[in-house]
């Protein structure tokens, strides 16, 4: 039985690495609840080609083996009973659905903060700004980046309540601009057209 399991894992790896004729995909809505829940859990970490392969599988047996292989390939300590990465993803999922669903009707994992938390994990720094009359409520998250993945050594993300209401959304320097963070006032002590000035004021 163990040999058969390993053989199936090897087949899935080959399917991911080599182009094969596409088989008819199963719609997510046609999957059992267990597999729909799993796809929700791994939404932000599963590769597009992995998801394609998963949706081409025609039996729950194959899906179970695929899921087992998915986690094993990401296990930082293979050969041990624990899979720290899988446990961490489950932990993050529980956290975001509890913490980030408080100000929105959507599940926490669907929010911008939930998405970033699922991908990046807990930020090294998290500053909540809600008591400055010049600024809309916002949060500044900071991370140490992984240079091997092309990330800067240190970077920050801003989440803010657009117009001061609703859920926190990820700030975009190009799409939003610094003024979107600011409550209009003619006597501000910083340049509202400079994101560096606004961030410096937050800090």
PLM-predicted stretches and their roles:
Residues 23-203:
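Residues within mature, well-folded domains
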Residues 1-8:
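Bacterial N-terminal signal peptides that target proteins for export
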Residues 8-17:
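Bacterial N-terminal signal peptides
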Residues 18-22:
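Sec/Tat signal peptide C-region and signal peptidase I cleavage site
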């Amino acid at each position: 039985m163990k040999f058969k399991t390993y053989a199936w894992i090897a087949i899935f790896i080959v399917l991911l690495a080599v182009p094969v004729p596409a088989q008819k995909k199963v719609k997510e809505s046609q999957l059992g609840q267990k597999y729909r829940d799993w796809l929700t859990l791994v939404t932000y970490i599963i590769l597009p080609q992995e998801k394609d392969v998963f949706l081409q599988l025609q039996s729950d047996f194959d899906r179970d083996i695929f899921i087992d292989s998915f986690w094993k390939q990401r296990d930082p300590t293979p050969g041990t009973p624990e899979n720290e990465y899988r446990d961490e993803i489950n932990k993050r999922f529980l956290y975001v659905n509890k913490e980030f669903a408080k100000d929105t009707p959507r599940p926490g994992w669907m929010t911008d903060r939930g998405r970033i938390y699922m991908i990046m994990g807990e930020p090294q720094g998290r500053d909540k700004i809600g008591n400055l009359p010049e600024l809309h409520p916002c949060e500044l998250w900071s991370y140490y980046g992984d240079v091997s993945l092309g990330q800067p050594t240190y970077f920050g993300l801003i989440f803010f309540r657009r117009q001061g209401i609703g859920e926190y959304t990820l700030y975009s320097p190009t799409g939003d601009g610094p003024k979107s963070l600011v409550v209009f006032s003619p006597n501000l002590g910083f340049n509202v057209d400079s994101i560096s000035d606004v961030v410096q004021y937050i800090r």
